[in-house]
Structures are given as structure tokens and as C-alpha cells.
Amino acid sequence: MAVYKIFPTQDTTLYSMYPTMNTGIDEILETSLDVNVSPTTSPQTSRFLIQFSSAEITDVINNKIAGATWQSNLRCFVADVTALNSDTSLEVYPISQSWNMGTGRYGNIPETQNGASWNWRAYSGSNIWTTGTFNIGTTASYSSSVSVGGGTWYVTQSLSGSQTFGYYDDKDININVTKITTAWYSSSIPNNGFIVKQEQEFINDINVQPHLKYFSIDTHTIYPPCLEFKWNDTIINSGSLPFITTQPFDVSINNNPGIFYSGSINKFRVFARPTYPTRVFQTASLYTQNSYLPTSSYYAIKDLDTNEYVVDFDSSYTKLSIDTTSSYFSLNMNGFEPERYYKILIQTIVEGSTITLDNDYYFKIVNG
């Protein structure tokens, strides 16, 4: 349960080129910079907004994390990237005004205007984004050569996050937003969601036109954005069993019925024993005696079809626990896409070697 994901309640993209267009149910979220869109237009940009339920955030912190040290990350998964610079930076801020997602899509004819856009917070002609005389600690950013708007956000230095992508780097967004989430949880600021934007905008340079597109909550793929919570739930309460200290050794995973409903919680037991146990005089078989894996042991979960990590190895947040029976870990199935198969991997350190064990242990999440 040391990794738990919640999903957005609403998201949309704001385009300076189309200042009244709403894209609330588009499958794509986009942050981009366009130069020379036509001979008469100035550089244009786009930003996206994404919001998560305050009730869900509070529930996770109060009832699941329950006092442990935790971290939260905004995760968005890339759909397409073009014209990337050698380094492109994205920024994340907490939005300072409320907004409405709407039901538009990019390119709708006629244009849908029933939700947030570059100019408006709700629908065309309703509440405009503040563009001057900002409340203390908030700001906006736009070019005088385009329509004013584009959202407003808090500018306290601690309430921000960023990520820089090198040309060959993974382009998925994975930004630590713990301080922002904490501010929402404590009601220091209202939860109006995140705004994600490029660090450099409105630059009139034909060589700087990065487009980064991410899957939205309305995607028909297995890659919706999420707010991922991680915390250390490791408990070391060892009994009389020995620890594995030498190679080779064998590992098996028990208490895996193979099928789980979304939202269920399962404790997977990890049994280990030396491949060639030392012979002793006893009546029980040496091959039935369990051992603990070293305390520096971790689990990971992969999607069986895509071979991508859904939960990656993490020395702080996916560490195995120990009780009098065995090593183990507990897993909450809430963040897993239903009707898919997943693989369990174990990583441990023995005799100074980092060993990753893939023994083809699978499970499936089903709709319940």
C-alpha cells in the first residue's frame, strides 16, 4: 500500500491561439509553443489545467498514509512530442482561481465554449481570468501581443515544481508536488488544481517550438494522468527465521490468488531459501524451511503487455516488510487499470550484488 494513485476530476487545455475554445473532454492535454502560425500572428502557447478531488486527497493522507512520511507526484504520460529542444522545462503551479472543465474538443466546428478557455474560467462570457490587480501571492503570465488570460496561479517559491527533459530523456511528467498537496490538505490555499506550462513561452524564435502532448482523463488508453502518493509502510518485526546471506537462493511468492478486484488490498508473502541448504540432522525437509530476504529488498509491478513499470523499485517506498512468517508486501489495487495482467518482480542485495528476480508471478485486475 506504499504507492496509491488517484485520478483527476477534471482537466483541459488553454490555447492562446483560440482564446474562447474549450477542450474539456479532449483526449489530449498539451503544452506547446508556436512561432509564425501565420504571417500576421505573434508567438502562441498552450497550457493545461488538471484538478484532483480534495476529499480523495484527505482520505489518502488521513486513512491510508495515517501519519507516515509521504510524497506526492503529478504523473502525466506522453502521447506525442515534436520539435523538442536539447533541454525543455515544464513548470507546475497551484491554480489560484476556480474553473470548469467544459465538454469541448480541439477543432470542434463550431467551437465549443462551455468551459474554461484562455480567456474564461467557466464559459465564454462568464468569469474572466484575472489579468491585473492580482491577489497577494498570485500572478499570471501572457503576452501583450495575444489575447490576455491563460490562468492564474500562486507564486510562493515553495508551491511550485518543475521538470527538465533532455532530448533523449523519458518525456513522461513525474514532478514532486508534495508541498502543493500539503497546502491543499491544510487548507492554506484552495484546491483549484495544477497548471502545467512551459518555462519559456511567447518566444519569437523559429528554432524554439516544442510541443508536448499528454493523455487526459478522457483517454481511451491505459495512461490517464494521476496524483501518485508514496510512503514508507515498511515494518521489520523478524522472528527466528534466518536471513538469506549468500547466493544462490530461490524465491517464491505466496498468497496470490491471481485475480483481484479494483480497490482490493492483498498481502503478498515472499518466501526464500538457499538453493543448496547446508545439511543438518533433522526430520523435516531442508527445502521446506523459509528464510527472510535481506532488509534491502524491494518489489515492483509491471504491465505484462507493455512491459512498463506501473510501480517501480524504490528504496524508500517499495521496501519489503518482515514478520514472524516471512518477508511480505501489501498492495492496493486501486491504481491499476482493470482487465489487465501484471507481473511481480523482486529486487534484493546479496553479497554486494543487486539481484532482480522475475519468476513469472502474475495477477489480473478485474472490474467488480
Predicted feature locations:
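Internal, hydrophobic beta-strand segments that form the core of beta-sheet-rich folds
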Residues: 195-199, 334-356
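Extracellular attachment/recognition segments
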Residues: 289
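Hydrophobic core positions of the immunoglobulin-like beta-sandwich fold
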Residues: 52, 331-334
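Short S/T/G- and acidic-enriched coil/turn segments that sit immediately N-terminal to beta-strands
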Residues: 326-330
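Short beta-strand elements
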Residues: 350-368
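Small/polar, repeat-rich beta-turn/loop motifs that tile beta-strand-dominated architectures
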Residues: 294-298, 342
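Secreted, disulfide-rich extracellular signaling modules
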Residues: 1-259, 264, 271-276, 285, ...
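Extracellular acidic loop/turn motifs
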Residues: 275-282, 292
